[in-house]
């Protein structure tokens, strides 16, 4: 079925910033629609998000240039192509852009088109998006990694690490895992309230209280887990996104950037030792960006120290890019990759990164961005790739709930065939 029209438009994301939405129209009248997310802390090797830089509009964050590229460059190039040729369409987008970083058309323009094409194709075939992307062997519902305390660049809280998450690994199914997470979230609200701390939420729906550093955040979560009636380490484990690239400079991890005078300055070896200490002390089973994207030696050391104990997720390190992932596999840096579709710019390249990771024994975590929309594509991608893990925020804000609710629908649709969570053989 051929594409007859592609329309791009400027909409707003969950932070009130402009982003790109794309409609792909087919000759039969079907429309596929996708909206593009945006990150606050971004890896320096991510594909380029095209912004207008016009300070008179949206503080320079407008996306009219990207929208124009959709309507005037991509539309005429793709019209007439079969919507079922996802790989060929994505290859055409890459050729049209002609740069490694997607800086001509903008990764936001390209991704909007790529995802909308997939959604239109699924609608044309009258099958769910996860089934269209993944084929018949798609049945794994992901363990949610719920960001219930925000720090770093995602909040004003004086904590260097960006995210403290809970993982309901002891649940029997996704629905129960979601319930467990919600109950802990509400228990944490009471824990914080009883201490006179703020229960306002950050970009991803987690709380952003003025806690006394990393250990205070972890212990507050453990208290909430127990208050909700669950056993830490058995029912629910803890994951962290350190976002270390945000405070790494000249070989030093400088916690004072976010924590003020209370923060420490740690060398590479001291950073590895600190994370190892935290894993020994608390039920932590996943650490994202424990070392900076430019600290490959540090990543090697961290992997030697903790690689057989916990999941070490590369986000800024790999930026959903097979080139960086290939290096990480070869140099034994990390054992997992975070998947963010807008880091690379097309669905095909995203799936290639996931496939490479799984082929080499790495896990993958399908992820949102801090600036989100009501688009639920990543929920389908998580199931389509049997990744078994999804990171899509806390238990508040509709832009986050949209993904969880889509996963509830998918689990219901799969029925007894659904399996909950990634299990490493």
Curated annotation (Swiss-Prot):
- Which residues are recorded as binding (2R)-2-phosphoglycerate? 162, 340, 369-370, 391
What is this enzyme's catalytic activity, as reactions?
(2R)-2-phosphoglycerate = phosphoenolpyruvate + H2O
Q: One MF term in GO for this entry?
A: phosphopyruvate hydratase activity
Its transmembrane ranges are: none
Any one cellular component term from GO for this entry? Answer: phosphopyruvate hydratase complex
* Entry note: cofactor: Binds a second Mg(2+) ion via substrate during catalysis.
Q: What Gene3D superfamilies does its record include?
A: Enolase-like C-terminal domain (3.20.20.120), Enolase-like, N-terminal domain (3.30.390.10)
Q: Does the keyword Cell division apply?
A: no
For this UniProt record, the keywords arranged alphabetically read as follows: Cytoplasm, Glycolysis, Lyase, Magnesium, Metal-binding, Secreted
Q: What is its main location?
A: cytoplasm
Which family does the similarity line name? Answer: Belongs to the enolase family.
Function comment: Catalyzes the reversible conversion of 2-phosphoglycerate (2-PG) into phosphoenolpyruvate (PEP). It is essential for the degradation of carbohydrates via glycolysis.
* Protein name listed in UniProt: Enolase
């Amino acid at each position: 079925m051929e594409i007859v029209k592609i329309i791009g438009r400027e909409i707003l994301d969950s932070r009130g910033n402009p982003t790109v939405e794309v409609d792909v129209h087919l000759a039969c009248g079907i429309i596929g629609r996708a909206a593009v997310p945006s990150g606050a802390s971004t890896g320096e090797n991510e594909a380029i998000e095209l912004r207008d830089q016009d300070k008179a509009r949206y503080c320079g964050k407008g996306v009219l240039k990207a929208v124009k590229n959709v309507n005037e460059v991509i539309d005429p190039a793709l019209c007439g192509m079969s919507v079922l040729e996802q790989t060929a369409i994505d290859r055409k987008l890459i050729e049209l852009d002609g740069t490694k970083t997607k800086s001509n058309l903008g990764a936001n323009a390209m991704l909007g088109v790529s995802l909308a094409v997939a959604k239109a194709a699924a609608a044309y075939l009258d099958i769910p998006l996860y089934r269209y992307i993944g084929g018949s062997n798609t049945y794994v519902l992901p363990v949610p990694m719920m960001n219930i305390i925000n720090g770093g660049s995602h909040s004003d809280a004086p904590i260097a690490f960006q995210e403290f998450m809970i993982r309901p690994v002891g649940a029997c199914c996704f629905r129960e895992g979601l319930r467990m997470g919600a109950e802990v979230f509400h228990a944490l609200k009471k824990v914080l309230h009883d201490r006179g701390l703020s229960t306002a939420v950050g970009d991803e729906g987690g709380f952003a209280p003025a806690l006394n550093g990393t250990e205070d955040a972890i212990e507050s979560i453990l208290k909430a887990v127990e208050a909700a009636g669950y056993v830490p380490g058995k029912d629910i484990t803890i994951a962290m996104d350190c976002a270390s690239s945000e405070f790494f400079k000249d070989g030093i991890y400088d916690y004072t950037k976010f924590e003020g005078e209370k923060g420490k300055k740690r060398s590479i070896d001291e950073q590895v030792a600190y994370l190892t200490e935290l894993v020994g002390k608390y039920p932590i089973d996943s650490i994202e960006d424990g070392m900076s994207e430019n600290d490959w030696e540090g990543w090697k050391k961290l992997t030697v120290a903790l690689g057989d104990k916990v999941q070490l997720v590369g986000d800024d390190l790999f930026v959903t890019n097979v080139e960086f992932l290939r290096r990480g596999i070869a140099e034994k840096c990390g054992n997992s990759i975070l998947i963010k579709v807008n880091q690379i710019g097309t669905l095909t390249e995203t799936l290639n990164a996931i496939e490479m990771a799984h082929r080499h024994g790495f896990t993958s975590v399908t992820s949102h961005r801090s600036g989100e929309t009501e688009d639920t594509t990543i929920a389908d991608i998580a199931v389509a790739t049997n990744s078994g893990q999804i990171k899509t925020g806390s238990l508040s804000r509709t832009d986050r709930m949209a993904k969880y609710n889509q996963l509830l629908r998918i689990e219901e649709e799969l029925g007894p065939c659904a399996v909950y969570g990634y299990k490493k053989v």
